[in-house]
Every structure is written in C-alpha cells, then in structure tokens.
Amino acid sequence: MSRIPTPQTIDDAPTASRPLLEAVKRQFGVVPNMFRLVSNSPVALEGYLGLFNSLSKGELPAATRERIALAVSEINGCSYCLSAHTYLGKKLAKLDDPEITANRNGASNDPKADAAVRFAVVLAKARGHVSEAELRALKAAGYSDAQAIEIVMHVALNTWTNYINEMAQTEIDFPVIKARTAA
C-alpha cells in the first residue's frame, strides 16, 4: 500500500491533474499507479509528462530508452520501475529476457546499445561525473552530442521516477519484478 494516497480514479485526482491523466489514459490505455500518485501534485505531473513526452521524440530509439530505464532502476533499487520497464521493454520495445537481464546488470547484448547503457550506469553511479574517456567511448560507439545529452536526461528522468516510487512505496500494478539492490 502506498504511503501517499493514490487517487483511485481520474475523477478522484485534483482538478488540474484530470486532463493530464486523461491524456495518459489515451496514450497507454490505462493510468498506471505512478501517474495517479504523482497527480497529487498537478505541477509535478505536468513537469514529468512534459519531459517524458519531449524525450520520446528524441534521437534515442525506444528500446535504448527502456534499456537505460532498466539499468538505472536496478541501480536505484526501484521494484515499481523495474516492473513497469520490464513489461514495457517486452511489450513495446520487444526486448527478450536475456537482454532485460543484461540491462539490469548494466549492459546490453546489442553493441551500440551497450555503450549507451554503460554510459548511463556511470552517470547514475557517479552522479554525472564521467571521465573524458567514458564520453569518448560513447561517441566512438556512434552516439552524437545530442544523444549524450538525451542519455543524461533519461538517467535524470528515471532517477526521479525511482525516487518518487520508492519514497511513496507505490503499489506495483505490473507483473512484479523485485530489484536486487536497495539504494
């Protein structure tokens, strides 16, 4: 049970959050608990959705974004986000079980994606303090400056969702995947 009350329906959410939750429902077909939880703060929900939707139009493929989410969620010990991104990774990004395991371990079986995931892991663990060599390795794998910045933003976005879900102990509404690590 969540430590912060989660509106059970869109109509239970604050008035300013309702159109945002309706948009989530149109996009996903359902409104996952995390979105309903965050709707307690309409400005937080608006900010999250703005960044989420902007990044979805970026240069990184959806599969790479899901790989990063899995790696960061494992680092931060967020079972809610691991559950959500395992589900989304399989259903939307078509990631298989060996790939998801590799992502949770901070790697990828795809050579180019591996560079992005490893860079994201360094960013998350070192709180942004990456070496010149680590940035060069990312670029050598074919990533642009814009994509490097997007990777930073995905790490930040996923860290935020990890923190909010761990703080609130959001009830998991996906097939449950337990984090191996606790932050």
Across the structure, where does each feature detected by a protein language model lie?
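Hydrophobic alpha-helical segments
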Residues: 1-183
